[in-house]
Amino acid sequence: MGIGRAYKAPSLYQTNPNYILYSKGQGCYASITGTGCYMMGNEDLKAETSINKEIGLEFKRDGWLAGVTWFRNDYRNKIEAGYAPISQTGTSKVKTDIYQWENVPKAVVEGLEGTLNVPVSETVNWTNNITYMLQSKNKETGDRLSIIPEYTLNSTLSWQIYQDVSVQSTFTWYGKQEPKKYNYKGQPVTGSEKNEVSPYSILGLSATWDVTKYVSLTGGVDNVFDKRHWRAGNAQTTGGDTGYMYGAGAETYNESGRTWYMSVNTQF
């Protein structure tokens, strides 16, 4: 059981009103011009604070380990880009909105973590951990803070064949990933912006040889079954009169295919 309070000061560029960043659109929550926006520092920004709580239960005996932990982080004054423009640039034919960094009054991240370690034999050990997200949202808008898996399971099976040789298999299972509910204009996402990533898993194999007490060699393969996931684009649709780049929802990253590797580790 534990409780703590965290503090995060805004960066220099976020508090300097003379420092301006330009975004092509993804940083503009509700831009009506479709031409991108400027982000201006805000000297009145407050520091982010959070109250972090966790409660856990653990069982340990003869190499066995089982545990579950509930955690919740409540944020106040979380720093994000503003939701509405405070001004526009100059008198040119195409005007550009200007936003400021602002404090989001309240946000919350809450979930469960589980652990299970099993001593299968004197030479084989099986370790597991899982994280399950209950919520991760901006309390002002009700939207998700980021695109993350509903759950992530990591499982490792290790076999110490000889004193100087071991092999290992790793298994990672990612849960469903959902996009944000609203686009950067503050409107509900539609079409391809609602794309989700279905659950998928990755398997890896490796072996390590301790050549001497100072040098070891490791070789292996990640993503044994060559599971591929392709990035389809940015999360949300952007553009204007000259054309659009349609959003891809949660399909915003690549999952590398099968990869072989070898490494040399030394210690002194």
Task: Kindly label every feature range from the protein language model.
Residues 7-8, 76, 81, 173-185, ...:
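C-terminal beta-signal and adjacent terminal beta-strands/loops
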Residues 3-5, 16, 72, 132, ...:
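A short beta-strand motif that forms part of the nucleic acid-binding face
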Residues 20-22, 36, 95, 184-189, ...:
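Short glycine/proline- and charge-enriched loop/turn segments
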Residues 5-67, 72-74, 92-112, 117-119, ...:
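Outer-membrane beta-barrel signature, preferentially recognizing the C-terminal barrel domain
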